[in-house]
Swiss-Prot record:
Protein name: Bifunctional polymyxin resistance protein ArnA
Active site: 104 (proton donor), 434 (proton acceptor), 619 (proton donor)
Source species: Salmonella paratyphi B (strain ATCC BAA-1250 / SPB7)
Segments for region (Dehydrogenase ArnADH): 314-660
Disulfide-linked positions: none
Length: 660
């Protein structure tokens, strides 16, 4: 059986050798060129392949049509991936009649994604393993062929566990590859309800928070011990790395981060003390804990600390236009939770952001983007990342005020985009799920799905086409003038501060707010055209975390990308949403303050929105780009989101209004 292998790292070497030992004919091996900035402590697949006389390649983009054609010419019967770092396209996966199979370093479906070796130690797991699974478009989600468990000892660190996993992988492959070669390939679907997903880890993730439990700090030390970058802290401005540690249960009442003793070197955590066995100051040598204390000049009672803001670097300045809106105020909260961000914002109101107005890293001006163009241009020039979030985004306004929608959503935002081009600033632009229009795909793919809208005499499409045209203009500026951009497409985000009941009273709100108003006022819940339209509802916390990761832009992976942000698992019709909302309303402790439920009322869309309206039957995102670029997976169930949103609005109704 002819195989093509994609491999890297020690696991790649183990995989290649196991495939050879099982009697496969390896037509070619694809690997990566080593990164000079990376600590390459592991075996070289390219050297192994060269020594075996097997053709080996390291293309920058193996999914390029040229390489797809070359792999097709090899006519593989089967494809294996052993710790190859890039996802393979569906075109490649479909080239092998027997299928494509990946070796993953966890017991799937747990710990999908990146760095499972480190994450299981961070989380204090007692068991992990390796899994061989069929490759599908979605990373780590294919049917399981075989797996092998590995116990994690309390004294295991990243390197010892790595060696255990390599040994387990070799045993697993030795047992299953001969069977697969005979055409007998086991296939067990993964249970999606048990799936967990983890993203890439960065060196800066090793920063110790001494306010965490001592077991958490110790597990972090284990997870990133050499040859990984290490867990670290600061004494004043001096950085030091902890390479090994042990848990001491008694912190002697000391505050977290306090040095309890220097010989042995022990530091207080939230519920105990960490004894530092070995470590190093700055770029020095590794020494025992007591010598490290001498080097750092530590004495009992000294307090270790977090680094100076951004380790001496200027904070990242984020400009949010429409900062008082639903996305803007939640994003502001997320950014201000990080020390290295400063937020500048403008909006015509400040009710939702009042809690930030005295924050030293929040700078707000009340104003209209269509008037304060000089302020906006100055702050685009001043800031690092620009988010133009101002838009009219409620369906009834598309038919009521189509020209105003075009003027604000397109013309005003185009001016901001041109400022970003002029001053070479990165823009994170809110596209919309509406751009997909009446697309017939089962799930909407950012890079492949057609964008289909209705006729000109249906003004409800003015919002969709305004956003779509801006998407295309931004893309063109990126291609022709080097604009750094990311387009994100929210799919029905919900949560507290979504909009207001007053907006719902004039019909200018999102669907759930309108439904809540009906319950609050004791009026019938209106189901437009029966409420059978399906949407995928996404919790604002999930959405904001994805958006935050776009702003962080780890490894510049979001540059030039379009990213859907939605929860495909939370698909429900508007009628189902209303039923769930009613159930939550009846169970709410404030239920007794509101009128009886007035029932459901089916209403034609024409009578509600006007003759210019046209609806879509479903809107479901593919989130593969978000998984790949952000290491992100939505996790919050729709019921939780509905209950939190309902609670926020019910508690916003004052007592007198409830009684009336």
């Amino acid at each position: 059986m002819k195989a093509v292998i994609f491999a890297y790292h020690d696991m790649g070497c183990q995989g290649v050798q196991a495939v050879l030992d099982a009697g496969y004919d390896i037509a070619a091996i694809f690997t990566h060129a080593d990164n000079p900035a990376e600590n390459t402590f592991f075996g070289s697949v390219s050297r192994l392949a060269a020594g075996l006389g097997i053709p080996v390649y390291a293309p920058d983009n193996v999914n390029h049509p040229i390489w797809v054609d070359r792999i097709a010419e090899l006519a593989p019967d089967i494809i294996f991936s052993f710790y190859y770092r890039n996802l393979l396209s569906e075109e490649i996966l479909h080239l092998a009649p027997a299928g494509a199979f990946n070796l993953h370093g966890s017991l799937l479906p747990a710990y999908r994604g990146r760095a499972p070796l480190n994450w299981v130690l961070v989380n204090g797991e007692s068991e992990t393993g390796v899994t061989l699974h069929r490759m599908v478009k979605r990373a780590d989600a294919g049917e399981i062929v075989a797996s092998q468990r590995v116990a994690i000892a309390q004294d295991d660190v990243a390197l010892t566990l790595h060696h255990k996993l390599c040994q387990a992988a070799r045993q697993l492959l030795n047992s299953i590859l001969p069977t697969m070669k005979c055409g007998d390939i086991p296939s067990v679907p993964q249970r999606e309800s048990d799936a967990t997903y983890y993203g890439r880890r960065r060196p800066e993730d090793g920063l110790i928070d001494w306010h965490k439990p001592v077991s958490t700090v110790h597990n972090l030390v284990r997870a990133v011990a050499a040859p990984w970058p290490g867990a670290f802290s600061y004494n004043g401005s001096q950085k030091f790395t902890i390479w090994s540690s042990r848990i001491c249960p008694d912190a002697q009442g000391a505050l977290p981060g306090s040095v309890i003793s220097v010989s042995p070197l022990r530091v207080a955590c939230a519920d105990g003390a960490l004894e530092i066995i070995t470590g190093q100051a700055g770029d020095g040598i590794t020494v025992q804990g007591s010598q490290l204390a001498q080097t750092l000049g530590l004495v009992a009672g000294a307090r270790l600390n977090r680094p100076p803001a951004t380790s001496g670097k200027r904070r990242i300045r984020v400009l949010i236009l429409g900062v008082n809106g639903f996305i803007g105020n939640h994003l502001t909260e997320r950014l201000l939770n990080e020390e290295n961000y400063e937020v500048y914002g403008m909006d015509i109101g400040s009710n939702a952001i009042s809690r930030f107005l005295l924050h030293p890293r929040f700078h707000f001006v009340e104003g209209d983007i269509s008037i304060h163009s000089e302020w906006i241009e100055y702050h685009v020039k001043k800031c690092d990342v620009v988010l133009p979030l101002v838009a009219i985004a409620t369906p009834i306004e598309y038919t009521r005020n189509p020209l105003r929608v075009f003027e604000l959503d397109f013309e005003e935002n185009l001016r901001i985009i041109r400022y970003c081009v002029k001053y070479r600033k990165r823009v994170v632009f809110p596209s919309t799920s509406e751009v997909y229009g009446m697309c017939t795909d089962a799930s909407f793919d950012e890079d492949k799905s057609n964008l289909i809208v209705g006729p000109v005499n249906k003004p409800r499409w003015i919002y969709s086409v305004s956003k779509q045209l801006l998407d295309r203009v931004i893309w063109a500026y990126g291609e022709k003038e080097g604009l750094r951009f990311t387009l994100f497409r929210p799919f029905n985000w919900m949560g507290p501060r979504l909009d207001s009941l007053n907006a719902a009273r004039i019909g200018s709100s999102r669907a759930i707010t309108q439904l809540i108003l009906n319950l609050v006022e004791g009026t019938p819940i209106k189901l437009i055209d029966g409420g059978q339209q399906k949407r995928c509802f996404t919790d604002i916390r999930d959405g904001i975390e994805a958006l935050f990761r776009i702003i962080v832009n780890d490894g510049d992976r979001c540059d030039g990308k379009i990213i859907n942000i939605g929860n495909p698992d939370n698909e429900a019709s508007i009628q189902e949403l209303a039923t769930l909302l009613l159930d939550s309303f009846d169970k709410h402790p404030l239920r007794c303050h509101f009128p009886p439920f007035a029932g459901f009322q089916v209403v034609e869309s024409r009578s509600y929105y006007g003759k210019g309206y046209q609806d879509v039957a479903h809107r479901k995102p593919s989130i593969d780009n978000a998984r790949r670029c952000l290491g992100w997976e939505p996790s919050i169930a729709m019921r939780d989101t509905v209950e939190e949103t309902l609670d926020f609005f019910l508690r916003s109704v004052d007592v007198a209004e409830r009684a009336s």
